[in-house]
């Protein structure tokens, strides 16, 4: 069973390579002697850096090339940041494993200010996420929000060069890259509700590859799977891509799941929030019901306007 080399498709960014090596470590810890090769690739999202993500088109922006490698046999598994995983998969492929979640919160990063509330009016804050932008604008309409693209190192360099007074990044990415010291504080879910699946690593493979699926089975983290299942069910119902102003965050308290969600107008003028508590075993249904509630309260109109403005989604 261990004589076959498992090839991992991954993006080439430092964070993506960290995730691929993390999965490699977990696989080899569970299957000593297993041979693994990394297949680094460049995705469309890595190439187009001069356009806001929402304008480029969010669905599959960072995963399509990896999925093609799975389909044509160049790779056996693809490792993704769950917040980049589209709501639908090509025929024959599927998400089979979700690893234990890292801290899913957003991080406030600044060279001179310790908190979002400390920023003077007119300060420039960098983020390309419509989800982060709408929450920032709701809380601090006096700030200037500008797009910020590139890998983590590039974004930090732009901050250090003085292009921005602060930037918002994922806590998980900074921790994984050994840059936790750059975090001024982790923003609470009340202040900045995370993205669907944020902080979790997912593994995609060919659904008919029983051998590989058997190798991956021990890596699945059930608690994380339940939480992300609820978040993704909500997102699927909303027909949300990766680059839309949707936040969703599920927490497990014993056998009870607490799911919070929001849909916001990018300018922060309208925010629709909701939450559900229920049995963790009903995670998917909770996500669907919460999405339906948000849609009935105006989320449909907000998202329609976003998609009209960003037709490439």
Curated annotation (Swiss-Prot):
GO molecular function, one term: hydroxymethylbilane synthase activity
Keyword Transferase appears in the UniProt entry: yes
Reaction(s) catalysed (UniProt annotation): 4 porphobilinogen + H2O = hydroxymethylbilane + 4 NH4(+)
SUPFAM superfamilies: Periplasmic binding protein-like II, Porphobilinogen deaminase (hydroxymethylbilane synthase), C-terminal domain
Transferase listed as a keyword: yes
Cofactor(s) in the UniProt record: dipyrromethane
PROSITE patterns tied to this protein: PORPHOBILINOGEN_DEAM
PTM annotation (S-(dipyrrolylmethanemethyl)cysteine): residues: 242
Keywords: Porphyrin biosynthesis, Transferase
GO CC terms of this entry: cytoplasm
HAMAP family: Porphobil_deam
Record-stated family: Belongs to the HMBS family.
Description of how the protein assembles with itself and partners: Monomer.
Listed name of the protein: Porphobilinogen deaminase
Organism listed in the record: Yersinia pseudotuberculosis serotype O:3 (strain YPIII)
